[in-house]
Amino acid sequence: MRKFFFGVLILTLFIIGTGVFFATRQAKNSLGLPSGYEYYWSTTCPHCAKVQEFMDSWEGKDKISLEKKEINSAANSNLLVRRASSCNISVNDVGVPFLFTPEGKCIVGDEPIINYLKEL
């Protein structure tokens, strides 16, 4: 009888442990959509400088919520990779400039970002 209860206890702990593992794994992978636009850039990126030049003179800059994230920060770099992976962009193909929209769309490159912003 003791072996039976011990077996049930081990099985129960295994099931609970597995559930907790998958629940925390899913929570780490799921990243909600931002309330505004997220723009990822680098100080050493010439294409980012082109986007910044456009943004400085862009009339619509006050009409949207845009959070600029410099990727030399490890936290911002990790967030960029997670955002890109949500658009099925592999780690090897992630680059800046990179714009992530509130709808979950990824836009990469200076001209695509500038053209997208002009349409807003």
Where are the model-predicted features located?
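Thiol-based oxidoreductase modules, predominantly thioredoxin-like and allied folds used
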Residues: 63-82
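Non-catalytic, surface beta->alpha helical segment in thiol-disulfide oxidoreductase systems
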Residues: 100-120
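Feature marks short, highly hydrophobic, charge-poor N-terminal signal-anchor/signal peptide-like helices
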Residues: 2-5
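Local sequence-structure signature of Cys/Sec-based thiol-disulfide redox active-site neighborhoods
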Residues: 27-69
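Extracytoplasmic/secreted cell-surface and envelope-processing proteins
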Residues: 48, 76, 107-110
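Hydrophobic membrane-insertion alpha-helices, especially the h-region
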Residues: 7-21
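Extracytoplasmic/secreted envelope proteins and their assembly/folding machinery
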Residues: 51-55, 77, 81, 114
